[in-house]
């Protein structure tokens, strides 16, 4: 029988961070993470512990940081060999959007375009109030809101310009090739879909989803601006198997704001995987998972692992809520 996403999605998915250093707090903690998880053994022992104890079955992998991501994949493979059990893989894959022969997936103008759309959607005051309370966003801005890209300091893409967006499929093939030897269960094209949805390029979205479906049975998508993007994708009948999006009670990285994301998540019929439930380590314990599983009625959640002690505490909290 062919597997469907509903039949294979577990309640808990083991996320990549902080094994690539990312703490969502500050550079000093990032450095400590890099030192703490500097080799495959330091990572695989955590996986071995939690899989044996809690029977977790799915892990996220990535390609954006080749050296550390390759080490992470090796740690998963070593774990599989030790425990004699297959770990299902959910692979993040960046979608390389091009404009004027340059990759713009995370360009300043792309950020400005998203800022402009978010602001127009909920209003300037609400949006600014959300942004300046978002500690993960501040971390992404290297701790300084002066680095924030807005539609005031950077020109958003116009509708006419967006008509010239393309997808670089040769580069996309390279990204997929990074996972050679991995048996990927779920492909997760990145939140570049936000830019394409907001600029109305649903033709490109359908095009690359069809491309990925030829290679992977299950294709979901990351979404960072779920309050706008999810309704747009559904209005335009985008054939996607589910969404992976930030969901935490503090509303961090939930754009345009927490309320719009909650509405979108509650009103889709597609499976949703919540991520960043702990708000980058700022909202811990059972309360984090009560928000995801009880309030939002989401059935699957991706969380950051960390050390054995950290992972143990997080999983216990989640299971207390799930039970």
Locations of the language-model features?
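Short, aromatic/basic amphipathic alpha-helical patches
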Residues: 74-79, 104-108, 316-318
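Active-site mouth loops of central-metabolism enzymes
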Residues: 24-42, 93-96, 119, 148-171, ...
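Glycine-rich, aromatic-flanked loop segments that form ligand/cofactor-binding clefts
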Residues: 8-9, 15, 84-137
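Structural recognition of the beta-strand scaffold that forms the well-ordered cores
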Residues: 13, 60, 90-91, 242-244, ...
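N-terminal small/glycine-rich loop or linker at the start of catalytic domains
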Residues: 5-34, 101-105, 130, 135-161
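Beta/alpha (TIM)-barrel catalytic core signal, keyed to glycine-rich beta->alpha loops juxtaposed to Asp/Glu
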Residues: 67-69, 95-99, 160-170, 176-183, ...
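N-terminal binding-site loop/beta-alpha segment at the start of enzyme catalytic domains
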Residues: 1-84, 291, 295
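Hydrophobic alpha-helical segments and helix pairs
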Residues: 109-191
